[in-house]
């Protein structure tokens, strides 16, 4: 694992390591690369707060809507990988149709990620779902205090190539424990106390990984805004 300083400059993620070196470390060497402090914590808190408020107004969905904006409260076992999980995801496949204030905040997060993804993978994405083929699925995930987690699972390397996990919460303030773990060449890498709010974790997309359980001392409640929040930049064809 390597930690690299980063910041946002005029809507572009600037890192203390060249793009080709970030890609080489993550893709070719299989390292976990953390871009430290890439986003301002106040922005991410605002994104998280506005997204949660939207989810309190819009009823939770029972099925995935890969062409629309929706959120789901999941307490289940995934069909393909049989990975148990409890989390609340917020999905913006039609980002342009989101309420204006929320859309503006989300774009301040996902536009810089779009540029970073293009630079690292060579894939140009947009926030409009095409008729066919792979496209980006902007997503926020909340692991509620009281038991949120995601069991060990993996993804196909292509077409994504590299995954992003943006930390939207402050450890010790919004949540006490829980974090993403990877297994690489038989070694477990636990990011629980390494990834802070504003950091972007860049990782090779076929690494085995899981999310450890949030604090069981807390009472679980879908309608609470606290817990561990992350943003992801998933790129796939849901109908392939």
Language-model region placement:
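Fe(II)/2-oxoglutarate
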Residues: 1-30
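Short amphipathic
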Residues: 33-39
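Signature of the catalytic double-stranded beta-helix
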Residues: 39, 74-137
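Cytochrome P450 catalytic domain signature, combining two hallmark sequence patches
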Residues: 52-64
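Short, conserved, surface-exposed binding loops centered on an aromatic residue
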Residues: 128-133, 153-158, 172
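Conserved short histidine dyad/triad with adjacent acidic residue
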Residues: 140-156, 169
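Catalytic core of Fe(II)/2-oxoglutarate
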Residues: 160, 169-240
């Amino acid at each position: 694992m390597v930690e690299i300083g980063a910041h946002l400059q005029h809507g572009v993620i600037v890192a203390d390591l060249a793009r080709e070196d970030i890609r080489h470390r993550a893709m070719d060497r299989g390292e976990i690369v953390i871009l430290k402090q890439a986003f301002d914590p106040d922005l991410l808190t605002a994104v998280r707060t506005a997204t949660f408020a939207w989810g309190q107004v819009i009823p939770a969905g029972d099925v995935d809507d890969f062409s629309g904006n929706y959120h789901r409260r999941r307490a289940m076992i995934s069909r393909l990988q049989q990975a148990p999980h409890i989390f609340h995801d917020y999905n913006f496949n039609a980002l342009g149709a989101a309420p204006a204030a929320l859309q503006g905040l989300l774009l301040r997060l996902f536009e810089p990620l779009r540029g970073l993804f293009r630079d690292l993978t060579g894939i140009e994405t947009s926030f409009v779902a095409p008729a066919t083929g792979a496209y980006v699925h902007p997503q926020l995930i909340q692991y509620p205090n009281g038991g949120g987690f995601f069991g060990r699972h993996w993804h196909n390397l292509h077409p994504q190539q590299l995954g992003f996990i943006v930390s939207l919460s402050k450890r010790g303030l919004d949540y006490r424990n829980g974090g993403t773990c990877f297994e690489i060449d038989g070694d477990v890498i636990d990011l629980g106390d390494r990834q802070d709010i504003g950091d972007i974790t860049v990782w090779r997309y076929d690494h085995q990984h899981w999310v450890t359980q949030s604090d069981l001392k807390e009472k679980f409640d879908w309608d609470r805004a606290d817990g561990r929040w992350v943003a992801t930049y998933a790129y796939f064809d849901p109908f392939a």
